[in-house]
Structure formats: structure tokens, C-alpha cells
């Protein structure tokens, strides 16, 4: 049978770091207040000449090098983002052109913080169906451009960045105990929660980009409560359970949410990859950034069982179980 094997990862961050103390100079907050509630110490902010596209290009190039491939080996590019360079055409098309790819196809996926999980799942479907042999999946965001920097409840949480992964279709034995690649995926959404996390603008309504708005306590409650269902479904689909995990790579929204989710699932803290302290919440870039960090520092190794999960505005949420 065919499985989608992840054979390369990459990441990119803007040059500018923004510490909690620096934020405290223009909004009523403090380092201790932010750390206590979120676990975030700093985040990276894109400069004027850094964009969702430029960060995505950089992350993609690193992933290609990591995989020992060139852009000629890629059939499809899927970009997960809520902060594209333009309303249209897609930022994925811009990245495709910048990388020198004139064959294949590319497009954007918008599922906010769950975007990378949704994009991976779509890429997996293309590979298993034979539509593509190799897919470059990118999560890239510049959320600093849609933040209200006077709102301390949101501006302290988010940062900019990009992460990328390459999926390749490979023939495997069909044994989940040893097969490398994506073993299962589960996606969900519920539009009843639109008012809890959203941008208050759009081309069809206000003709503006709008600012990010969030009901933090509501998001926290639902993040811990609903994400575990797709995780349980992922394990059930292959007859496994969380105790078999080597690594848990969750959406890096808030350290308290991550810890509460891991506790609910019975996952030990030493198996949880946490980068929110250094990156903040980078939305669709969060999971691939954390994944690339753990691969590059040697924590995640071939054969490891890894769970990726995320929840985003809408709400949208999903999980991917993969053997590295």
C-alpha cells in the first residue's frame, strides 16, 4: 500500500525578536503577566520587507535541502495561511514561481491555526490517490499585520514565522506497527463558534483586512475540550493509544492549553514538544515550526510515533498520526 512519508522539514523566522518587556512599553502588561498566563517569553515579528510569501519560500528551501531534493521533484505545493500577501492570486502560486516551479499545481488552504493539519491531510489524499508523488506543505503567517497592538489580550500572544514539510508517496507493507508515514488523519469544524476567534474585516464585508478578535476564556475551554476527540479517533483508526507515542507536537497557542491537553490524554510532559515560549502563537506555522525544531535538534528520529494536532478559528480542529 501507499503511505505519505515525511522526508524533509524546514523553518524560517523573521529577523526581529520582540520580548515581553518590549511589548510592556506600549501596552499595559508585564513579562510576568504574559509568562504566567501563556508561557510566552518572546516572539518574532516580520519587518516591512518580510512577508508570508518570503518566509514560506525560506522554509520551503530548507525543507528541500533537508530532504535532499530540488523543486523539480515536487508536484504540488499547498500553503496553509490566513495572512496571504494578496486576496488573490494565492500566495502558494507566488511561492511556486519564486522557487522556479512551472510544472504541477499549488494553492492556499485557510483553516487558521489548524491550517497545516488540514493541508497535510489534503496532501496525503493526493499522494495516496496517485494525483501527486511529492507534495510540499507549508504553513506561513504574518499575524503581526492583523493584530490590534492596543489590545493586550491578543497582541501578546502571536508571532510570525513559517514551517514546511515534504511528503513523498512510498510503498509500504501495510503494517501500522512498522510503516513509516502518515497512519491516520482526522479533521473537524463547527461554525457555531465563529464569534470566539475571528478577524473583524474582509473584502466582501468591510473591504478591509480587519483585526484579530478573540474571547480567550472560551477558546481555552474549547481547545482542551474538543481537540481530544480527533486525537482519540486517530489512534482508534489504527488500533493504537496515546501511551505508545514518542512525541506529541501540538499547536503552540498557549502553554497552559498544551499542558492541559497532554494531561487529559495521559501524555507525559517529556514527550511534548513546546516552542510557544520562543515563537508565540504563529497560527498555521506553529505545528511545522515546532516539528522542524524537534527534528533538527535530534529529538524526533526515524521510527518515532508522532502526533500532530491543532485547533483554530471557526472552530476548526484536527490531528495527524505519523511514524517518522
Swiss-Prot record:
Transmembrane segments: none
Name of one Pfam family that matches: ACP_syn_III_C
GO molecular function list: 3-oxoacyl-[acyl-carrier-protein] synthase activity; beta-ketoacyl-acyl-carrier-protein synthase III activity
Superkingdom of the source species: Bacteria
Keyword Transmembrane helix: no
GO biological process: fatty acid biosynthetic process
Localization: Cytoplasm
Keywords annotated in UniProt: Acyltransferase, Cytoplasm, Fatty acid biosynthesis, Fatty acid metabolism, Lipid biosynthesis, Lipid metabolism, Multifunctional enzyme, Transferase
GO annotation, cellular component aspect: cytoplasm
Catalysed reaction equations from the record: malonyl-[ACP] + acetyl-CoA + H(+) = 3-oxobutanoyl-[ACP] + CO2 + CoA
Pathway(s) served: Lipid metabolism; fatty acid biosynthesis
EC class name: transferase
InterPro entries in UniProt: ACP_syn_III_C, ACP_syn_III_N, FabH, Thiolase-like
Catalytic residue list: 113, 251, 281
Sequence segments annotated as region (ACP-binding): 252-256
EC number: 2.3.1.180
Physiological role: Catalyzes the condensation reaction of fatty acid synthesis by the addition to an acyl acceptor of two carbons from malonyl-ACP. Catalyzes the first condensation reaction which initiates fatty acid synthesis and may therefore play a role in governing the total rate of fatty acid production. Possesses both acetoacetyl-ACP synthase and acetyl transacylase activities. Its substrate specificity determines the biosynthesis of branched-chain and/or straight-chain of fatty acids.
Family under the similarity heading: Belongs to the thiolase-like superfamily. FabH family.
Domain notes: The last Arg residue of the ACP-binding site is essential for the weak association between ACP/AcpP and FabH.
Subunit structure: Homodimer.
NCBIfam families associated with the record: fabH, PRK09352.1
Protein name, entry field: Beta-ketoacyl-[acyl-carrier-protein] synthase III
The organism of origin for this protein: Bartonella bacilliformis (strain ATCC 35685 / KC583 / Herrer 020/F12,63)
Source taxonomy: Bacteria, Pseudomonadati, Pseudomonadota, Alphaproteobacteria, Hyphomicrobiales
Amino acid at each position: 500500500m501507499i503511505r505519505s512519508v515525511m522526508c524533509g522539514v524546514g523553518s524560517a523566522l523573521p529577523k526581529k525578536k520582540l520580548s515581553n518587556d518590549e511589548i510592556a512599553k506600549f501596552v499595559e502588561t508585564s513579562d510576568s503577566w504574559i509568562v504566567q498566563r501563556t508561557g510566552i517569553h518572546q516572539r518574532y515579528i516580520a519587518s516591512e520587507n518580510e512577508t508570508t510569501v518570503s518566509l514560506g519560500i525560506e522554509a520551503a528551501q530548507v525543507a528541500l535541502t533537508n530532504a535532499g531534493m530540488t523543486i523539480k521533484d515536487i508536484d504540488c505545493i499547498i500553503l496553509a495561511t490566513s495572512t496571504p500577501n494578496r486576496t488573490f492570486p494565492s500566495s502558494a502560486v507566488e511561492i511556486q514561481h519564486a522557487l522556479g516551479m512551472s510544472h504541477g499545481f499549488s494553492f492556499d488552504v485557510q483553516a487558521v491555526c489548524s491550517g497545516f493539519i488540514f493541508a497535510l491531510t489534503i496532501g496525503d489524499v493526493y499522494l495516496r490517490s496517485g494525483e501527486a508523488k511529492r507534495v510540499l506543505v507549508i504553513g506561513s503567517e504574518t499575524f503581526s499585520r492583523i493584530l490590534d497592538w492596543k489590545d493586550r489580550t491578543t497582541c501578546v500572544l502571536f508571532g510570525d514565522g513559517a514551517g514546511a514539510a515534504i511528503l513523498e508517496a512510498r510503498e509500504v507493507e501495510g503494517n501500522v506497527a512498522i510503516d513509516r508515514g502518515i497512519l491516520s488523519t482526522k479533521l473537524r469544524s463547527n461554525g457555531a463558534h465563529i464569534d470566539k476567534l475571528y478577524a473583524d474585516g474582509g473584502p466582501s464585508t468591510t473591504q478591509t483586512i480587519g483585526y484579530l478578535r478573540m474571547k480567550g476564556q472560551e477558546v481555552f475551554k474549547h481547545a482542551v475540550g474538543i481537540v481530544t476527540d480527533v486525537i482519540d479517533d486517530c489512534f482508534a483508526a489504527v488500533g493504537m493509544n496515546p501511551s505508545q507515542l514518542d512525541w506529541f507536537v501540538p499547536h503552540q497557542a498557549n502553554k497552559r492549553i498544551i499542558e492541559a491537553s497532554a494531561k487529559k490524554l495521559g501524555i507525559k510532559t517529556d514527550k511534548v514538544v513546546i516552542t510557544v515560549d520562543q515563537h508565540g502563537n504563529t497560527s498555521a506555522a506553529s505545528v511545522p515550526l515546532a516539528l522542524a525544531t524537534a527534528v533538527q535538534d535530534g529529538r524526533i528520529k526515524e521510527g518515532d510515533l508522532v502526533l500532530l494536532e491543532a485547533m483554530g478559528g471557526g472552530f476548526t480542529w484536527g490531528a495527524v498520526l505519523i511514524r517518522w
